[in-house]
């Protein structure tokens, strides 16, 4: 089954926040993405609200509930108490936990699962008790022991950090090596019964090879490249192009 496409709206929100104006409207572009066949929406509400604002979350939750009940809402973030309360209020289908420092421009590494196992176990239990699926951001470095530790936290999935693979857009041999490591990490998770998501710097060009190497890839969340392409092709056509890259459309 092809990977589901979840459209990350942070870049849309960042553009909106350049002015004290309500456009571009994050909810409107979320609706366009879902109308074009995206299966979910992803947001990463950072503490300083420089991209998605906390006030966006109930609007996006209502959009999905009222108009696209089969779609999923995925909220990413570092599991601070404030973040966990946001998730408990918004009730996303999935929470993706990332080890970000608040000052980071973007997520750029996975969890050190050995160092944070106890902390993550408690957080995962809390979120799952509230009815949410939990995914943990993981380095795609082929470390099977790290994946086993992630499994031990009780998490349902890992999200492969695909940034190193995405950065090899002009270096095919290096891209092949990174893809092999991602595949090994995914295989380890799959063997343990975990679901596998992917995200970061995925594009129309590099997504097909990832989907071919990891045929059980459950979901990809894509924002930067998708938003950039939408400037040229429009949101609806861009979503269709990414769905084709996932193998969903012929």
Curated annotation (Swiss-Prot):
Belongs to the PNP synthase family. 1-deoxy-D-xylulose 5-phosphate binds at residues 46, 51, 106. It comes from Allorhizobium ampelinum (strain ATCC BAA-846 / DSM 112012 / S4). GO terms for biological process: pyridoxine biosynthetic process. Keywords: Cytoplasm, Pyridoxine biosynthesis, Transferase. Pathway: Cofactor biosynthesis; pyridoxine 5'-phosphate biosynthesis; pyridoxine 5'-phosphate from D-erythrose 4-phosphate: step 5/5. CDD domains: PNPsynthase. The active site is at residues 44, 76, 200. Homooctamer; tetramer of dimers. The keyword GTP-binding does not apply. This is Pyridoxine 5'-phosphate synthase. PANTHER family: PYRIDOXINE 5'-PHOSPHATE SYNTHASE.
């Amino acid at each position: 089954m092809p990977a589901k496409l979840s459209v990350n709206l942070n870049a849309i929100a960042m553009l909106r926040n350049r002015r004290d104006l309500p456009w571009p409207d994050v909810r409107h572009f979320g609706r366009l993405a879902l109308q074009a066949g995206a299966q979910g929406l992803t947001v990463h509400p950072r503490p300083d609200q420089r991209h998605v604002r906390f006030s966006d979350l109930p609007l996006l939750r209502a959009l999905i509930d009222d108009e696209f009940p089969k779609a999923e809402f995925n909220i990413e973030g570092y599991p601070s108490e404030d973040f966990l309360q946001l998730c408990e209020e918004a009730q996303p289908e999935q929470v993706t936990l990332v080890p970000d420092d608040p000052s980071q421009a973007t997520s750029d590494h996975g969890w050190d699962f050995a160092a944070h196992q106890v902390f993550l176990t408690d957080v995962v239990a809390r979120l799952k008790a509230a009815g949410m699926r939990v995914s943990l951001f993981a380095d795609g470095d082929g470390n099977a022991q790290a994946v086993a530790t992630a499994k031990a936290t009780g998490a349902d999935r890992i999200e492969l950090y695909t940034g190193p693979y995405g950065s090899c857009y002009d270096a095919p041999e290096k891209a092949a090596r990174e893809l092999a490591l991602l595949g090994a990490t995914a295989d380890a998770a799959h063997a343990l019964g975990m679901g596998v998501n992917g995200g970061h710097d995925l594009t129309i060009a590099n997504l097909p090879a990832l989907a071919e190497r990891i045929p059980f890839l459950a979901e990809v969340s894509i924002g930067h490249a998708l938003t950039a392409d939408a400037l040229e092709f429009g949101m609806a056509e861009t979503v269709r192009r990414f769905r084709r890259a996932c193998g969903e459309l012929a």
